[in-house]
Swiss-Prot record:
It comes from Pyrococcus furiosus (strain ATCC 43587 / DSM 3638 / JCM 8422 / Vc1). The keyword tRNA processing does not apply. This is Sulfhydrogenase 2 subunit alpha. Ni(2+) binds at C60, C63, C402, C405. Optimum pH is 8 for hydrogenase activity at >95 degrees Celsius. Part of a bifunctional enzyme complex that functions as a hydrogen-evolving hydrogenase with sulfur-reducing activity. May play a role in hydrogen cycling during fermentative growth. Activity exhibited with NAD in addition to NADPH. The alpha and delta subunits form the hydrogenase component that catalyzes the reduction of protons to evolve hydrogen. Keywords: Cytoplasm, Iron, Metal-binding, NAD, NADP, Nickel, Oxidoreductase. Its cofactor is Ni(2+); Fe cation.
Length: 412
């Protein structure tokens, strides 16, 4: 017998799952990423390196900054492009803006209805309208940062190898800093709400993140420093996304692995919240990825004013994007809101000849299946099929999957 979750709701993209029942016992769980492959690597082949980040920004509207930054970092390594410190800090600001936008969308509009027992955020408005309004306000602020640095709210084209097409003014940055301070109280409230959520899903034993908080030159897996090609990618016949394993174990990426592997990097009230809820987070239940996102949202709002002050006090040096070689190979590691994102290029005479991208949801797919399997085993026979399906979707949503991103890498 197969119990089908016909379509995941309140997630980005199209996916479904099957729970396999044999002789009255739960035997398997399969997550089917059914959204069609998009072949973004193919689109980059033969393209001038300068055009590639703008193409990669089209992979996802929600996390285009991460794709753009990972792309330019890979190109800069391949072609020996120097990047001023102020450019790096403006990119960091853009990434925090994206985390603010994406986490607000997920927490307030997609995951919060699960906490309060509603089918969707619209149904919450009569009793929890202020929370919905706060979430939309925070999301709009994150988009304002993305528009300022990336050029557009979605699919921006301002992030370039070595720098930017347009640089923000001092007045624009100061406005962003002040606005961020006014939103901290909202994020503080949402942390407490998600701390009350019931644990569930599999335990993510193999945690993976970039070596620095938002990017790095290598990955950290349970404290061990590795390169992405040491993680095995395995195609599966029922899904357009591969499974990822490290030494035979599924990996887990996202806000929870970031906080557990690199939580010493955060400061302020978010750091105190991290310590207060550390026991929950260290249980590594995937459901607490929501709590981790809430803490990270708080930190992002605290970090933005600090970062703006650093940028303005040091001054903005504009990068020129000058290359030192026309051929080379580079890997860009960036933390997208949902976890580790990899862009890898080989460039010859200024043209991309080989391209590979791995997204957070692709890394997480196998652990998502194991989480559904564990939860189905716990609930089958004691809950109605309808209630079990609802709970399984709660587990899926905790991963905050971006399914449109996950299918782009299937190759012809």
């Amino acid at each position: 017998m197969i119990i089908e979750l016909d379509e995941f709701t309140r997630v980005e993209g199209n996916g479904k799952a099957e729970i396999v029942i044999e002789n009255g016992e739960v035997k398997d769980a399969r997550v089917k990423i059914v959204e069609g492959p998009r072949f973004f690597e193919i689109l980059t082949l033969g393209r001038d390196y300068w055009d590639v980040p703008d193409l990669e920004a089209r992979i996802c509207a929600i996390c285009y900054i991460a794709h753009s930054v990972a792309s330019v970092r890979a190109i800069e390594k391949a072609l020996g492009i120097d990047v001023p410190e102020s450019v790096e800090k403006l990119r960091e600001l853009a990434l925090w803006g994206e985390i603010i936008e994406s986490h607000a969308l997920h927490l307030y509009l997609l995951a919060l209805p699960d906490v309060f027992g509603y089918p969707d955020a619209i149904s919450m408005i009569p009793r929890h309208g202020e929370l919905v309004k706060e979430g939309l306000t925070i999301k709009a602020f994150g988009n304002a940062i993305r528009e300022l640095i990336g050029g557009r709210e979605i699919h921006g084209i301002n992030i370039k190898p070595g720098g930017f097409g347009r640089y923000p003014s001092e007045e624009e940055l100061e406005k962003i800093a002040e606005h961020s301070k006014s939103l901290i109280k909202f994020a503080r409230r949402i942390v407490g709400i998600f701390a009350s959520q019931e644990a569930g899903g599999a335990v993510g034993e193999v945690l993976m993140a970039t070596s620095d908080y938002l990017w790095g030159d290598e990955l950290i897996i349970n404290g061990e420093r590795v390169q992405y090609y040491e993680v095995d990618e395995v195609p599966v016949g029922y899904s357009f996304a591969k499974h990822s394993y490290y030494k035979g174990n599924p990996v887990f990426v996202g806000a929870l692995p970031r906080l557990l592997l690199k939580g010493e990097s955060i400061e302020g009230e978010a750091a105190r919240m991290l310590e207060e809820y550390r026991d929950k987070l260290e249980s590594k239940y995937v459901i607490y990825n929501n709590l981790a996102q809430a803490i990270e949202l708080l930190y992002a709002l605290e970090r933005v004013p600090q970062l703006v002050e650093e940028i303005l006090s040091e001054g903005i040096e504009r990068g020129n994007g000058e290359i030192s070689q026309e051929s080379g190979e580079g890997v860009g590691y960036v933390e997208a809101p949902r976890g580790v994102l990899v862009h890898h290029y080989r460039i010859e005479n200024g043209k991309v000849v080989w391209s590979n991208t791995i997204t957070p949801t692709a890394f997480n797919q196998r652990l998502m299946e194991l989480s559904l399997l564990e939860e189905a085993k716990r609930l089958y026979g004691s809950e109605s099929e309808e209630n079990m399906k609802k709970r399984l979707e709660v587990i899926v949503r905790a991963f905050d999957p971006c399914i449109s991103c996950s299918v782009h890498f299937v190759k012809l």
